[in-house]
């Protein structure tokens, strides 16, 4: 092995980890000098330097999530359904706030079960999100997955998340049946029951996919503060508010509320914001 190589941590297990290096998966161990550091803790997704099978350096992370523990995420793939279960707007918007605050580059939204009867007004609300640069895909079990959807995974580290019942597993199976088999193999214990497992990355289309069984961000610390800064579409408006700590409700010269009154920002979305923080 050359003196200096770089790999990506796929799975971290106690004192060793699985690393994707040179198109193969190897087992590597952090050097003792790294382990002795008080703040040292490897994360799935870490970019690491390798020398003779040992991890000698962890490169700076561009972002990191705590649930699941994964670093250097390129995109969060948010999966929702309009019906069965009905779309939970507050949960969806909370997730967008959380991931916006974590500096995730892209958050494509996938809407499943579009072959079932749904309220067209709910679909229109989703379409409203496109003006804020969210990619939106509608998928049905009766139609092939759009090529534009498959292309978003190319050479990216993608994390899947979605509430139970929205069809996340079915979607992963349609993308690549072998991925679902690998994920299920990790999430079944010796009694055949599903269990929460270690976060693991799987290679896909030159990038990596991370599934998140049971991942839900319902309670977020400092939600009111985060939402005021990172709610959908607020990022380009908050600098024009009179107060730097504006909560966009009753404050003087608030650019957000002015935009709502002038129909420059969707009123239904603003009402969801107020419901979220109050």
From Swiss-Prot:
Acetylation found in the keyword field: no
Cofactor annotation comment: Binds 1 zinc ion per subunit.
UniProt keywords, alphabetically: Cytoplasm, GTP-binding, Hydrolase, Metal-binding, Nucleotide-binding, Ribosome biogenesis, RNA-binding, rRNA-binding, Zinc
TM region(s), chain numbering: none
Keyword Zinc: yes
Chain ranges of the CP-type G domain: 62-218
Gene3D superfamilies, per the entry: P-loop containing nucleotide triphosphate hydrolases, Probable gtpase engc, domain 3
A single GO cellular-component term on record: cytoplasm
GO BP, sorted A to Z: ribosomal small subunit biogenesis
InterPro entries, per database record: G_CP_dom (IPR030378), P-loop_NTPase (IPR027417), Ribosome_biogen_GTPase_RsgA (IPR004881), RsgA_GTPase_dom (IPR010914)
Residues that coordinate or bind GTP: 112-115, 162-170
Ranges in coiled-coil conformation: none
EC number: 3.6.1.-
This protein's name: Small ribosomal subunit biogenesis GTPase RsgA
Protein's organism: Mycoplasma genitalium (strain ATCC 33530 / DSM 19775 / NCTC 10195 / G37) (Mycoplasmoides genitalium)
């Amino acid at each position: 092995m050359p003196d200096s190589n770089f790999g990506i941590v796929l799975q971290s297990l106690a004192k060793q980890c699985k690393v994707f290096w040179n198109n193969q998966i190897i087992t590597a161990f952090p050097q003792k000098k790294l382990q002795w550091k008080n703040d040292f803790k490897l994360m799935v997704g870490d970019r690491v330097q390798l020398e003779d099978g040992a991890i000698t350096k962890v490169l700076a992370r561009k972002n990191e999530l705590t649930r699941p523990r994964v670093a250097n995420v390129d995109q969060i793939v948010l999966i929702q359904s309009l019906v069965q279960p009905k779309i939970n707007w507050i949960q969806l918007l909370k997730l967008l706030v959380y991931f916006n605050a974590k500096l995730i580059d892209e958050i494509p939204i996938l809407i499943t079960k579009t072959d079932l009867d749904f309220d067209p007004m709910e679909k229109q609300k989703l379409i409203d999100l496109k003006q804020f640069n969210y990619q939106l895909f509608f998928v049905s079990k009766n139609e092939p997955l759009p090529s534009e959807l498959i292309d978003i995974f190319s050479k990216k580290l993608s994390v899947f998340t979605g509430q139970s019942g929205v069809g996340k597993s079915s979607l992963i199976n349609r993308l690549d049946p072998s991925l679902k088999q690998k994920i299920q193999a990790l999430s079944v214990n010796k009694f055949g029951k599903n269990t929460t497992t270690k976060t693991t990355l799987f290679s896909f289309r030159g990038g990596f996919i991370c599934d998140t069984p049971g991942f839900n961000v319902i309670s977020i610390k400092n939600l009111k503060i985060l939402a005021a800064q990172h709610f959908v579409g607020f990022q380009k408006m908050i600098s024009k508010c009179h107060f730097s700590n504006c909560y966009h409700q009753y404050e003087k010269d608030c650019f957000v509320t002015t935009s709502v009154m002038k129909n420059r920002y969707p009123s239904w979305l603003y009402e969801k914001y107020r419901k979220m923080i109050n």
